[in-house]
Amino acid sequence: MMKIYQLLVACFFLLCFFSLEAQEQKKLDAAQTMLCQGNYFTESEGKAFLDGQKNLYTTQKEWEKRAKLIRQHILKGAGLEKFPKKCPLNAIIGEKRVYDGYQVQNVAFESLPGVYVTGSLYMPTSAKGRLPGILSPHGHWSKKGDVGRYRPDAQKRFAAFARMGAMVFGYDMVGYGQMGELGWTHSAPEVLKLQLWNSIRCLDFILEMGADPEKIACTGASGGGTQTFLLAAIDQRVKISVPVVMVSAHFFGGCVCESGMPIHKDLNFQTNNVEIAACIAPRPMLLVSDGDDWTKNNPEVELPHLKYIYQLFNKPDLVQNVHLPNDKHGYDLNKRAAVYPFLAKYLGLDLSKAMNTDGTVREDMIVIEEQQALYPFDNQHPFPANGIRSNDQVKWEK
């Protein structure tokens, strides 16, 4: 009799286990159907979606209500409805390397207990008082010798911004750089959540370092453009947004860090990256686009919709687009030549430190460092004992 009872109890617990497992799988399957990835819309569908959305907001108040809803859905879809408790940053800051008009220090800090964000801090050598702050995330460049924030084009913009008078933090995406070598990967399912949280903590870091809270900008290209407009949408401490070659009515991002969680859609809600980018309105925003990727329609499709939203605030001139029809995807020279004057204007930077009076770019004095030279962990600054070495070890506070 006892054996039969034990068998029945065991069967009951097995049924409960498989029932819970089935429920969790059902939730996962439902979330998957809500994903908007890559070319989720055709170009014509993207334009039609924006045209239809105008009926939802014909006044400033109606747009503000819509923007609030978009922010809520981003945070809900990313699993950040409730922020985890912010741990001390415990920043590890390396020695200064001084160059012509700027200096560089490698940095690591904790975004969550044991989770280290790695990057480099660029500053003008003649810094006085509170400096404007620029966060600059990178895109998905991952070929050996041409990786993320270590690429020459990235180092050039970091250094140029610093020469112009800004505090600049260029930081690694999850699984890139030294953390990738330690065991982290960029392909984990919830990398969007951690990456967005890391960007929030990067803002905390530059503010803790003394950046002017009224002059904070974010700019990056491709996947770095996605990080730019997502952060600007959900964190109002970002005062200026410059997403490069990314904002599109029809393309939602092809990486799990951009669209691998249901931030764009649920059963009763749909948005796209144009509306997400617009959440910063009426603060200044510059789109930089080219003729060879999903931003090719910016002058005819995305910009007019953004102008429509900014006009609701009577500030249509605060959103701009520089379109380069003969350029390709990247943050190359022509893109930087478009961004430098915009950030100089709105952050009060010295444009002469990066551009000549004839409009040509001045970057010949900038030193391109080797990738390993930009790593924060070395013999003098070893990887901390509490440091997490893989995505699956991350603990989110419930």
Model-derived segments and their meaning:
Residues 1-28:
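Bacterial Sec-dependent N-terminal signal peptides
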Residues 23-116, 288-398:
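Alpha/beta-hydrolase-fold serine-hydrolase catalytic core, especially in secreted/extracellular enzymes
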Residues 94-149:
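Glycine-rich active-site/cofactor-binding loop and its immediate structural neighborhood
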Residues 128-208, 247-257, 262:
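Cap/lid segment of the alpha/beta-hydrolase catalytic domain
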Residues 210-222:
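Alpha/beta-hydrolase fold nucleophile elbow
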Residues 215, 239-278, 283, 290-303, ...:
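Mobile cap/lid helix-loop segments that gate and shape the active-site cleft of serine hydrolases
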Residues 220-230:
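Glycine-rich nucleophile elbow surrounding the catalytic serine of serine-hydrolase chemistry
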Residues 233-239:
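Conserved hydrolase catalytic core segment
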